[in-house]
Amino acid sequence: MGNCAKTPWHRGSKERWQWPGSPLGGSRPSPGPRTEEQEGTQGYSVLGSLVGPACIFLRPSIAATQLDRELRPEEIEELQIAFQEFDRDRDGYIGYRELGACMRTLGYMPTEMELIEISQQISGGKVDFEDFVELMGPKLLAETADMIGVRELRDAFREFDTNGDGCISVGELRAALKALLGERLSQREVDEILQDIDLNGDGLVDFEEFVRMMSR
């Protein structure tokens, strides 16, 4: 496979990837009506303001122009950083389950069924970086306004992870929330947020859990 990091990538070069339920080369399907559970988490969107530049917001008129251009070098670099983050054995490939975590790092929340359908398009159940760019490039162009930069998220994660052990403890997150939001959140609200974030109940927030939190 070629090194996409060296050559500007054209969205029209290959179009074999598609989101399940979407036209070929189209954007992610629009979500259905919000459930009661989803409405209950809407209040946590205030957490998105904690990282400031982590979210890139563009006016719709500007975002519309993103579809008909090449990926910029810094965008390919962002995809490469995300890919390498989950290519843990450094063999140049990631499996479809790792692909799901990698996509979440970039701000996408694929369902298990979507990942299974995507995996059926993958030869050998793995993707290399060129395949990854083919899959994520159109999404990056189509939804620039919703993207979350992995580098900015990493920087924000390190701000929370004050002892540098790779995980955010309940105490670290509580202290950060209090410092950043002050009295805007009660102790009960902080505890509810922590309970919602700590998906595996180990008392620690790892990077993937942090990404899920910031993507709300």
Swiss-Prot record:
GO terms for biological process: sensory perception of sound; visual perception. Keywords: Calcium, Cell membrane, Cytoplasm, Golgi apparatus, Hearing, Lipoprotein, Membrane, Metal-binding, Myristate, Repeat, Sensory transduction, Vision. Disruption phenotype: Mice exhibit synaptic hearing impairment and impaired auditory brainstem responses. Enhanced inactivation of Ca(2+) influx in inner hair cells (IHCs), whereas its amplitude and voltage dependence of activation is normal. Reduced normal spontaneous and sound-evoked firing of spiral ganglion neurons (SGNs) seen. Mice exhibit normal retinal morphology but altered light responses of retinal ganglion cells. It holds the Pfam family EF-hand_7. The keyword Repeat applies. A lipid is attached at residue 2 (N-myristoyl glycine). One of its GO terms (molecular function) is calcium channel regulator activity. Residues 1-41 are annotated as: Disordered. Ca(2+) 3 binds at residues 198, 200, 202, 209. It is a lipid-anchor. Residues 20-29 have a biased composition (Low complexity). Residues 74-109, 125-142, 148-183, 185-216 form the EF-hand domain. Expressed in the inner hair cells (IHCs), outer hair cells,(OHCs) and vestibular hair cells within the ear and in the retina (at protein level). Expressed in the retinal cone type 6 ON-bipolar cells and type 1 OFF-bipolar cells (at protein level). Expressed in the organ of Corti and spiral ganglion neurons in the cochlea (at protein level). Ca(2+) 2 binds at residues 161, 163, 165, 167, 172. Its main location: cytoplasm. Gene3D superfamilies: EF-hand (1.10.238.10). Ca(2+) 1 binds at residues 87, 89, 91, 93, 98. It is found in: Cytoplasm, Perinuclear region; Cell membrane; Golgi apparatus. GO terms for cellular component: Golgi apparatus; perinuclear region of cytoplasm; plasma membrane. Required for sound encoding at inner hair cells (IHCs) synapses, likely via inhibition of the inactivation of voltage-gated calcium channel of type 1.3 (Cav1.3) in the IHCs. Required for the normal transfer of light signals through the retina. This is Calcium-binding protein 2. The lineage of its organism: Eukaryota, Metazoa, Chordata, Craniata, Vertebrata.
